[in-house]
């Protein structure tokens, strides 16, 4: 199949125009595509999401810290919702997930462990690439 000079020139021009546009998107090595979705304030190096959760400049605390009020002893009110066993210093939720004699939570049996390699079976569900990257890394593309 032969191409006319006009087709070759048009193809070359479209590549020359597309290449700089692609480079304009690329920022720096190892930046995930999600970094483009959450824009960064270049002056302060903060993500725009930092403005959504405003920061108290005097104390350096997020406004969300006021929503979960703190006790005089430095404990969040949420600590009262999950009561603490004073004798053992454990949250009551520790009783909901019962523990085995070997100090393993029952949830460890739900996600069985490969004894030889010490890996959870879930590691087989997300297969790994030869370079040690999870296949999910390809779903969220990384800007090399």
From Swiss-Prot:
Nucleus found in the keyword field: no
Domain of life, source organism: Eukaryota
Keyword set includes Transferase: no
Alphabetized UniProt keyword annotations: Repeat, Signal, Virulence
Entry protein name: Ribosomally synthesized cyclic peptide phomopsin precursor phomA'
Reported modifications of this chain: PhomA' is processed by several endopeptidases including kexin proteases as well as the cluster-specific S41 family peptidase phomP1' and the peptidase phomG' to produce 5 identical copies of the hexapeptide Tyr-Val-Ile-Pro-Ile-Asp and 3 identical copies of Tyr-Val-Ile-Pro-Phe-Asp, that are further modified into phomapsins A and P, respectively. The timing and order of proteolysis of the phomA' precursor and PTMs are still unknown. Two tyrosinase-like enzyme phomQ1' and PhomQ2, catalyze the chlorination and hydroxylation of Tyr, respectively.
Range of residues in the leader sequence: 1-18
Pathway, per record: Mycotoxin biosynthesis
Free-text function comment from the UniProt entry: Ribosomally synthesized cyclic peptide phomopsin precursor; part of the gene cluster that mediates the biosynthesis of the phomopsins, a group of hexapeptide mycotoxins which infects lupins and causes lupinosis disease in livestock. The phomA' translated product contains a 5-fold repeated peptide embedding the hexapeptide Tyr-Val-Ile-Pro-Ile-Asp and a 3-fold repeated peptide embedding the hexapeptide Tyr-Val-Ile-Pro-Phe-Asp, that is converted into phomapsin A and phomapsin P, respectively.
Propeptide, residue positions: 19-35, 42-50, 57-65, 72-79, 86-94, 101-108, 115-123, 130-137, 144
